[in-house]
C-alpha cells in the first residue's frame, strides 16, 4: 500500500505554507477576544440602526426617506 500522508507538493502549496506555520499555537490569555467582542457589539448596533431606518421607526429630522421612489425602475 502506498503512503499518501505527504500529499502532492504544488507551487500554490509552497506559496501558502508560511501562512500555516502558526498552526496549533495559541496566544496566552484572552488575546484579542475583548476587541472582537467590541466590534461584534458595534456591528449589532449598526444592524439595528439600519433595520430601524428601513422600518421607518426612527424619525430623521430634515432627511426624507421615501422608499416608493426606488420601486419605479
UniProtKB/Swiss-Prot annotation:
<keyword id="KW-0793">Thylakoid</keyword>
<dbReference type="GO" id="GO:0009523">
    <property type="term" value="C:photosystem II"/>
</dbReference>
<dbReference type="GO" id="GO:0050821">
    <property type="term" value="P:protein stabilization"/>
</dbReference>
<feature type="modified residue" description="Phosphothreonine">
    <location>
        <position position="4"/>
    </location>
</feature>
<dbReference type="InterPro" id="IPR001056">
    <property type="entry name" value="PSII_PsbH"/>
</dbReference>
<keyword id="KW-0934">Plastid</keyword>
<dbReference type="InterPro" id="IPR036863">
    <property type="entry name" value="PSII_PsbH_sf"/>
</dbReference>
<dbReference type="GO" id="GO:0009535">
    <property type="term" value="C:chloroplast thylakoid membrane"/>
</dbReference>
<keyword id="KW-1133">Transmembrane helix</keyword>
<dbReference type="GO" id="GO:0042301">
    <property type="term" value="F:phosphate ion binding"/>
</dbReference>
<protein>
    <recommendedName>
        <fullName>Photosystem II reaction center protein H</fullName>
    </recommendedName>
</protein>
<keyword id="KW-0604">Photosystem II</keyword>
<comment type="similarity">
    <text>Belongs to the PsbH family.</text>
</comment>
<dbReference type="GO" id="GO:0015979">
    <property type="term" value="P:photosynthesis"/>
</dbReference>
<dbReference type="Pfam" id="PF00737">
    <property type="entry name" value="PsbH"/>
</dbReference>
<keyword id="KW-0597">Phosphoprotein</keyword>
<keyword id="KW-0602">Photosynthesis</keyword>
<comment type="subunit">
    <text>PSII is composed of 1 copy each of membrane proteins PsbA, PsbB, PsbC, PsbD, PsbE, PsbF, PsbH, PsbI, PsbJ, PsbK, PsbL, PsbM, PsbT, PsbX, PsbY, PsbZ, Psb30/Ycf12, at least 3 peripheral proteins of the oxygen-evolving complex and a large number of cofactors. It forms dimeric complexes.</text>
</comment>
<keyword id="KW-0150">Chloroplast</keyword>
<feature type="transmembrane region" description="Helical">
    <location>
        <begin position="34"/>
        <end position="54"/>
    </location>
</feature>
<keyword id="KW-0472">Membrane</keyword>
<keyword id="KW-0812">Transmembrane</keyword>
<comment type="function">
    <text>One of the components of the core complex of photosystem II (PSII), required for its stability and/or assembly. PSII is a light-driven water:plastoquinone oxidoreductase that uses light energy to abstract electrons from H(2)O, generating O(2) and a proton gradient subsequently used for ATP formation. It consists of a core antenna complex that captures photons, and an electron transfer chain that converts photonic excitation into a charge separation.</text>
</comment>
Amino acid at each position: 500500500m502506498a503512503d499518501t500522508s505527504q500529499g502532492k507538493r504544488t507551487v500554490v502549496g509552497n506559496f501558502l505554507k508560511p501562512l500555516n506555520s502558526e498552526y496549533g499555537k495559541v496566544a496566552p490569555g484572552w488575546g484579542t477576544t475583548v476587541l472582537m467582542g467590541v466590534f461584534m457589539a458595534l456591528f449589532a448596533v449598526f444592524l439595528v440602526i439600519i433595520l430601524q431606518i428601513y422600518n421607518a421607526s426612527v424619525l430623521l429630522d430634515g432627511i426624507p426617506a421615501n422608499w416608493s421612489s426606488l420601486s419605479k425602475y
